Amino acid sequence: MITKAIYPGTFDPITNGHLDLVTRASAMFSHVILAIADSSSKKPMFTLDERVALAKKVTAPLKNVEVLGFSELMAEFAKKHNANILVRGLRSVSDFEYEWQLANMNRHLMPKLESVFLIPSEKWSFISSSLVKEVARHGGDITPFLPKPVTKALLAKLA
C-alpha cells in the first residue's frame, strides 16, 4: 500500500530543521510531497520558484520526496494529489495551539485528512526560517542552521 503524505510550509528558506523532518517523514511514508505555499501575504524573501528550487536541491538524495509549490487550500491540494496525511512539526506548546486549529479545519474540509505531528530533533527545535533570516540580517553565523546551498542563496539575497 502506498502511503502518500504532504509536508506543507512556506520554507522561506528551508532550514536544517525542515530537512530533518522531511527526511524522517520519508522513512515513514512511501511518498512525501514537500508542498511549498505561495504565501504571498507573508511577503517571503524568496519567490515561490526560488523556494521550490532550493528545496529540490537539498532534498534530491531523498528519492521518495517530491517538491511542489501550491496556492490553493491544503485540503484541495491533498485531494488533487491523493494524499490523506499531513506531516507537521511541533517545536513548542505555542506551535501546538496553531497546529491544532489547522488540523481541525483541514479535517472539516477533508474528513479523511489526518495530521501527523513530528517533534524536531533537539538540536533543531529552536530554529525557524524567520529567526535564521534575522540572524543573517545582523551578520550572525547562519551556517549551522541551513543546508549549504540555502546559506549561499540567503547571503546573496542580503548582499
Swiss-Prot record:
Major location category of this protein: cytoplasm
One cellular component (GO) term of this entry: cytoplasm
UniProt pathway: Cofactor biosynthesis; coenzyme A biosynthesis; CoA from (R)-pantothenate: step 4/5
Cofactor: Mg(2+)
Source superkingdom: Bacteria
Positions contributing to substrate binding: 10, 42, 74, 88
UniProt EC number: 2.7.7.3
Binding site for ATP: 10-11, 18, 89-91, 99, 124-130
Residues of the site described as Transition state stabilizer: 18
Catalytic reaction equation(s): (R)-4'-phosphopantetheine + ATP + H(+) = 3'-dephospho-CoA + diphosphate
Intracellular or extracellular location(s): Cytoplasm
Single GO MF annotation: pantetheine-phosphate adenylyltransferase activity
Cytoplasm as UniProt keyword: yes
GO biological process: coenzyme A biosynthetic process
Role: Reversibly transfers an adenylyl group from ATP to 4'-phosphopantetheine, yielding dephospho-CoA (dPCoA) and pyrophosphate.
Subunit structure: Homohexamer.
Family (UniProt): Belongs to the bacterial CoaD family.
Name of the protein in question: Phosphopantetheine adenylyltransferase
Organism: Yersinia pestis
Gene: coaD
